[in-house]
UniProtKB/Swiss-Prot annotation:
Family statement drawn from the similarity comment of this UniProt entry: Belongs to the bacterial ribosomal protein bL20 family.
Keywords tagged on the record: Chloroplast, Plastid, Ribonucleoprotein, Ribosomal protein, RNA-binding, rRNA-binding
Organism of this sequence: Arabis hirsuta
Name listed for the protein in its UniProt record: Large ribosomal subunit protein bL20c
Any one GO molecular-function label of the UniProt entry: structural constituent of ribosome
Chief place where the protein resides: plastid
Signal peptide: none
Any single GO CC term annotated in Swiss-Prot or TrEMBL for this entry: ribosome
Matches recorded under HAMAP family: Ribosomal_bL20
Lineage, broadest ranks: Eukaryota, Viridiplantae, Streptophyta, Embryophyta, Tracheophyta
């Protein structure tokens, strides 16, 4: 059989890996085997937390809305507010409502007056 010369393929792969892991601490940025393990862990965490970020922001918006609703006495509860929004077919999502609640309370009052039964 003929000999296969691989050239610098392995070095290229390790260099690419080293660039990815250059910000890691200790042996995780120096040793190839631990670099590969940490890279896998980092990518798994990034993938998992992209989904978690969406849930966290939704929770934040709901918490902000609930706080403003209780503080101002616009409604008795958050879920009655959302329920009435859907009944009146107002297409405002939680993100927009939270922004309105923080920055423009008078607009929130007009929305609540619009949807009150």
């Amino acid at each position: 059989m003929t000999r296969i010369k691989r050239g610098y393929i392995a070095r290229r792969r390790r260099t690419k890996l080293r660039l990815f892991a250059s910000s890691f601490r200790g042996a995780h940025s120096r040793l190839t085997r631990t670099m590969t393990q940490q890279r896998i862990r980092a990518l798994v965490s990034a993938h998992r937390d992209r989904g978690k970020r969406k849930r966290d922001f939704r929770r934040l918006w709901i918490t902000r809305l609930n706080a403003v609703i209780h503080e101002t006495g616009v409604f008795h509860s958050y879920n009655r507010f959302i329920h009435n929004l859907y009944k009146k077919q107002l297409l405002l999502n939680r993100k927009i409502l939270a922004q309105i609640a923080l920055l423009n309370r008078s607009c929130l009052y007009t929305i609540s007056n619009e949807i009150k039964e």
